[in-house]
From Swiss-Prot:
Keywords: DNA-binding, Metal-binding, Nucleus, Phosphoprotein, Repeat, Transcription, Transcription regulation, Zinc, Zinc-finger. The gene is zbtb8a.2. It holds the Pfam family BTB. Its main location: nucleus. Transmembrane segments: none annotated. SUPFAM superfamilies: beta-beta-alpha zinc fingers (SSF57667), POZ domain (SSF54695). A zinc finger (C2H2-type) spans 299-321, 327-350. It comes from Xenopus tropicalis. Residues 24-92 form the BTB domain. May be involved in transcriptional regulation. PROSITE patterns: BTB (PS50097), ZINC_FINGER_C2H2_1 (PS00028), ZINC_FINGER_C2H2_2 (PS50157). The lineage of its organism: Eukaryota, Metazoa, Chordata, Craniata, Vertebrata. This is Zinc finger and BTB domain-containing protein 8A.2.
Length: 455
């Protein structure tokens, strides 16, 4: 025969012993606070304490002390109360900290409860938001008829769309009250505004901000007349509002108007008309030209997916496909694909006076080394390396018709290039157009300049 009350009574007795500091054989230090508890309760409640107390099971007569700095004292207080009472005090402020501490202490039940609490809180928030949206939709649906320029769902009454356009135009010209505010009928729905909560009103006010002018030049008696405005130019619907005789003051307060000069209103209409005309012309031009006939703003490489905005950049990019190196060094004859690479090579190698051998990386001079050529590339080798490899392996004579670059002190001056095919150009960044029948050479990516080795 099971007695369910025995478990709760046993927990209450243990909790009372803990609070009175009776038979407590484990001390927990957190942020200068000391928590006293029983080993058996900690061992049975937490996987971390189970592992910790199992290691110190030999010292049964002495109290065990543990220090934690990964969570706060308030968090451990809530967890310790849960161990002795089975009740977890969760709130939106401490649920994350408690779940983190429970994860550290290996308390799976507490982690599950925290996850359920977070999920239920999110569900409640979703329901509240859905309910708020439903209330807003109902209010706006019931209050679609309003006297104003904007549709905010606060208007009252049912209006008749039967006024001719001539009467409205005459009213707008003769009346000193510009009907840009709201005119409401409070006798139809006297308590509709009170049914909306304060949060709903704030949210609606945030999404529908209307200029709030305290009053207009109209008197309360003038507001008792018919307030007719043109609601939409597309449908031609006219709104008519009749206010009762017994609510002059409330009508005067609710029917807020924005005083705007008629000249400014006409100017706005003229500007809108001009904007429509310009937009129609632009759309007509687009329709005549079509999207395919518009000029392209990018240049695409015919050999890869690279795209550039300038034609000069495309021509420079094509050098990596054709294998051309149109910029040679004047001193050693080494060729480069970019002019800035030649200048950097000349400054770091030749102006520094430290040319190095391409193979052994030793410093060479004009006497101890020579320039050799391998295909379109030229580099310097010392006499020892040339003797090891063989003089016949590399031609060491430079053709006179090879293009040279003059690296003078004035680097801004653009040099003139002489190519084999007789084509001359003064722009080092732009080459002739490359047709689709270009032969692509396989180029080794070892054209970077050699940094001198300082011994």
């Amino acid at each position: 025969m099971d007695l369910p009350s025995h478990h709760s009574r046993l927990l209450r007795q243990l909790d009372e012993q803990r609070r009175r500091n009776l038979f407590c054989d484990c001390h927990i230090m957190i942020d200068g606070h000391t928590f006293r508890a029983h080993r058996n309760v900690l061992y049975a409640s937490s996987g971390y304490f189970k592992m910790l107390l199992s290691q110190s099971s030999g010292n049964v007569g002495q109290p065990t002390t543990a220090t934690f700095d990964v969570f706060s004292a308030d968090t451990f207080t809530a967890i310790l109360d849960f161990m002795y009472s089975g009740k977890l005090n969760l709130s939106g402020q401490n649920v994350i900290e408690i779940m983190s501490a429970a994860s550290y202490l290996q308390m799976t039940e507490v982690i599950g409860v925290c996850k359920m609490f977070i999920k239920s809180s999110l569900d409640i928030n979703e329901k509240d938001r859905d309910g708020f949206l439903d209330i807003s939709d109902k209010e706006t649906g019931q209050q679609t008829g309003q006297c104003g320029l904007y549709s905010t769902g606060w208007g009252m009454g049912r209006y008749h769309c039967n006024q001719p356009e001539g009467d409205i135009a005459a009213y707008l010209e003769t009346s000193s009250c510009t009907p840009y505010g709201f005119c409401s009928r409070t006798d139809e729905h006297p308590s509709s505004q009170n049914s909306i909560s304060t949060a709903t009103m704030k949210m609606l006010d945030r999404h529908n901000r209307i200029p709030q002018i305290p009053s207009s030049t109209c008197s309360p008696e003038e507001h008792l007349r018919e307030c007719r405005i043109l609601e939409s130019d597309d449908t031609g619907c006219h709104i008519e509002v009749e206010l009762p005789q017994g609510e002059e003051t409330e009508a005067f307060l609710n029917c807020q108007t924005v005083v705007q000069p008629r000249s400014r209103r006409r100017h706005s209409l003229n500007r809108a008309t001009k904007a429509d005309e310009v937009y129609a012309k632009i759309m007509g031009i687009k329709g005549c030209l079509g999207e395919d006939n518009l000029p392209s703003l990018h240049f695409k490489c015919p050999f890869c997916t690279h795209t550039v905005k300038r034609k000069a950049d495309l021509k420079r990019h094509l050098l990596c496909h054709t294998g051309e190196r149109p910029y040679p060094c004047q001193a050693c004859g080494k060729r480069f694909t970019r002019l800035e690479h030649v200048r950097s090579h000349y400054r770091t190698i030749h102006e520094a006076g430290k040319p190095i051998c391409r193979w052994c990386k030793r410093h060479v001079t004009e006497d101890s080394g020579q320039v050799v050529q391998e295909g379109t590339r030229r580099f310097r080798l010392c006499n020892k390396c040339v003797a090891e490899v063989g003089v016949g392996s590399f031609p060491n004579e430079v053709d006179d018709d090879e293009p040279t670059i003059i690296l003078s002190g004035d680097e801004d001056k653009e040099p003139t290039w002489n190519f084999h095919d007789g084509i001359q150009t003064s722009d080092p960044e732009i080459i002739e157009d490359v047709s689709s029948d270009v032969v692509i050479h396989k180029v080794d990516d070892s054209d970077d300049e050699i940094k001198p080795i300082i011994c």
